[in-house]
């Protein structure tokens, strides 16, 4: 009987793992918009405007007009003129992709179909030669994560892939200057994450609090408030529909109204007292008039967009007088919303969810809940580095109110600093682009197509969660 020769080490070793494709495409897959584009090379641009120029914002929706015309994704930015009674179908619900059929249609339209891609900078010509960085909301269900991984790697066949918890990527941004800390990192050295960062992400579907330590989320400390921009818009629709015009079917228009007029009050009880209608009988109208504004609704017949203007309490009387005298036809055709306490009671639910009957704590309290599960020694570092991102943080007064309330409930010895990046909507994408510039760091998190085919989606899920 012949003896079997032992296998050499070269024969026993696994096949050489492929390196990641050089091109890296980033999709911050938000519920309201996609933030997408190719990551720049190393070193990334120091100028913020130049760095963000590679990122495009695309509506993450399929919409149908009252004339039954369909618009997909980027078409909503360029082709729609009449937003009245527009019906939206969104693939993301409560922060997670739950309808991949619709999401695939939007991605195909925005990135893959040569006929519909609006810019060559957004075209993914060869997925097999591209690494995809895809964001997800914290604490996604494993089934939803597996669906995403299988579609990305099996449907499109990307050469490299990594799925990140979105808020975490903000740790790779240059946030030291926001907090007034010295920038100790040389522009030519590899980019590394900030050591301690508490990210408050208030977007379309929800608000999350994510403590990030050395580039990794502390999972047990992540907290979520089920209120986002969608809920603010719906609340405003209800209030206006009860008090003035029926705007229940005008989601887009009321979202525009919300962005134009709402603010977070630093003296809620005082502002509410000022705008109380009973004050008119007592002659206390001056302060209320400073809060109350008019919003002229858009006119699809003339193409005129909606806009805010100071409230004129005599406008109705002037309008009646103009009708009698045959006055300006354009002014007579205006539909105007008069907005007083609606301006600040709507965003107030981010801080006091009980106002609408929700049994959840507001943003300042869930930040303290998040820190309560961490070692006490870390509390000062996180409270001194609170970064707010997401569209809701652009509401005037949000930053000041959050910092004020945190100071009131935090330990007296802790310094509280709350900062917002220059562009809180695209900040997560920017962080991903800076991480992608550090190829060695990206390789720690990402997988290649060869690895996915060899080990499968379950292994990929463990890799992305940091278990491997």
From Swiss-Prot:
InterPro entries: Actin, ATPase_NBD. Keywords: Activator, Chromatin regulator, Cytoplasm, Cytoskeleton, Nucleus, Transcription, Transcription regulation. The keyword Lipoprotein does not apply. One of its GO terms (biological process) is chromatin remodeling. Component of the SWR1 chromatin remodeling complex. Belongs to the actin family. ARP6 subfamily. Component of the SWR1 complex which mediates the ATP-dependent exchange of histone H2A for the H2A variant HZT1 leading to transcriptional regulation of selected genes by chromatin remodeling. Involved in chromosome stability. This is Actin-like protein arp6.
